[in-house]
Amino acid sequence: MDPYKVIVRPVVTEKAISMVERENKLTFIVDKRATKPDIKKAVETVYEVKVDKVNIVITMKGEKKAYVKLKPEYSASEVAARIGLF
């Protein structure tokens, strides 16, 4: 899949912002057909970071939400600031 089509939008909620600050995780709504390797590759390509792991949840609305944990040498706060979450 095209990395720019995998990530639909970032999630901007209190929980998502607290995860950025405390756990070095970013939260995105992603394409329903995307797999964990697709999401990892897309985040690494689009935001120029290294991903540690990806967790996926299908929401009650039918959207696929991805929790992306970054490697310790990268800051989720800096990436969030670049994409306009803060």
Curated annotation (Swiss-Prot):
InterPro entries: Nucleotide-bd_a/b_plait_sf, Ribosomal_uL23, Ribosomal_uL23-like, Ribosomal_uL23/eL15/eS24_sf, Ribosomal_uL23_CS
Keywords associated with the record: Ribonucleoprotein, Ribosomal protein, RNA-binding, rRNA-binding
Single GO biological process annotation from the record: translation
Domain of life: Archaea
Xref: Gene3D superfamilies: 3.30.70.330
GO molecular function: rRNA binding; structural constituent of ribosome
Entry's Gene Ontology cellular component terms: ribonucleoprotein complex; ribosome
Keyword Ligase tagged: no
Matching Pfam families: Ribosomal_L23
Record's keyword annotation contains Ribonucleoprotein: yes
NCBIfam families for the chain: PRK14548.1, uL23_arch
Role, per record: Binds to 23S rRNA. One of the proteins that surrounds the polypeptide exit tunnel on the outside of the ribosome.
Record's subunit section: Part of the 50S ribosomal subunit. Contacts protein L29.
Family: Belongs to the universal ribosomal protein uL23 family.
The protein's name in its UniProt record: Large ribosomal subunit protein uL23
Organism: Thermococcus sibiricus (strain DSM 12597 / MM 739)
